[in-house]
Amino acid sequence: MNPGRLPPRLLAAVAFGGAAVLLTGLWFGPVLVRRTDRVGWLLYVGLPGLAAAVSGAVFGRPLAHPRGPANGGRAFLRGAGIALAALFLFAPLYATMVKVTEPGWTSVAGLTILVLEFGGLALGWELVLVGGLAGWGLHRWARRASPPGGA
């Protein structure tokens, strides 16, 4: 696949969205497989993937279309930052969807704060690690796939 043919934002969205779906699917999948409701899959796998894809599309262009000298450390840090941005996007999305699908929840803002706190505590280190690896991998792949001399 030639990264020059696909928009860099699309490549970043697919890379980070795929990494998020993989991480959350492995984390929550064993529990969700036993349940038959689709809302659980949406809340715990779909929304994190969507949030990561949007964050990747917004902030990941430099990883998918690298310019200048290669720097894997910066790519890792950018990827980790994209993962954290995805958490900040996911929290209000999750809180809103819970309010819509589960009657009785009254405060989207309060649930957003809870999701940020517990999401950061439970999965924060994994988000940073997986996001950093996704950023580093995307940067490395784009460097190898782009023609010599950059563009």
What does each model-identified segment do?
Residues 1-151:
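Juxtamembrane/disordered regions of integral membrane proteins
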